[in-house]
Amino acid sequence: MGIPMGKSMLVLLTFLAFASCCIAAYRPSETLCGGELVDTLQFVCGDRGFYFSRPASRVSRRSRGIVEECCFRSCDLALLETYCATPAKSERDVSTPPTVLPDNFPRYPVGKFFQYDTWKQSTQRLRRGLPALLRARRGHVLAKELEAFREAKRHRPLIALPTQDPAHGGAPPEMASNRK
């Protein structure tokens, strides 16, 4: 006396459904690329800012950047936090006096360290869909030429109309030259 085929198939399908749910729960984290990666890093790191590559002192093996790790491999919260910059000092921490910078010290971010405010405008531009060509100063002339080309292409007639009406006694010049 064996198990009926219908019941064994039902048991098999039930097992496969539970197995696929368990595999989906333990699968590696998702990958993050481009703007999603930047937005996630901004959310995770907050005001601390973040690096695209870890400083050499933290990593003993060949250094891979956050893009290579999160875009091409799986990415989780612990990995994202390793790319956050060192936390800013709290307002209560007055153990060391503030550092006085010389007047000729550059005021722009140096290296691969980015603050949230500098990325905020870039991500807003990306969300609006402005191409990089329009954001560059030297690209404005090229952008105007591209727009003029698109405008001319948009208003091009579908067919070329003859210059003379053939019904009223004259064929177009193209037709007259073909008959000779």
Swiss-Prot record:
Organism lineage:
Eukaryota, Metazoa, Chordata, Craniata, Vertebrata
Q: Keyword Lipoprotein: yes or no?
A: no
Q: Which GO terms describe its molecular function?
A: growth factor activity; hormone activity; insulin receptor binding; insulin-like growth factor receptor binding; integrin binding; protein serine/threonine kinase activator activity; receptor ligand activity; transmembrane receptor protein tyrosine kinase activator activity
Q: Segment D: which positions?
A: 86-91
Biological process (GO) annotations held by this record are: animal organ morphogenesis; embryonic placenta development; embryonic placenta morphogenesis; exocrine pancreas development; genomic imprinting; glucose metabolic process; in utero embryonic development; insulin receptor signaling pathway
What's the protein name? Insulin-like growth factor 2
Region (A), start-end ranges: 65-85
Annotated region (C) at: 53-64
Question: Could you say which protein family the record assigns here?
Answer: Belongs to the insulin family.
Q: Where in the cell is it found?
A: Secreted
**What intrachain disulfides are recorded?**
C33-C71, C45-C84, C70-C75
Q: Which Pfam families match?
A: IGF2_C, Insulin
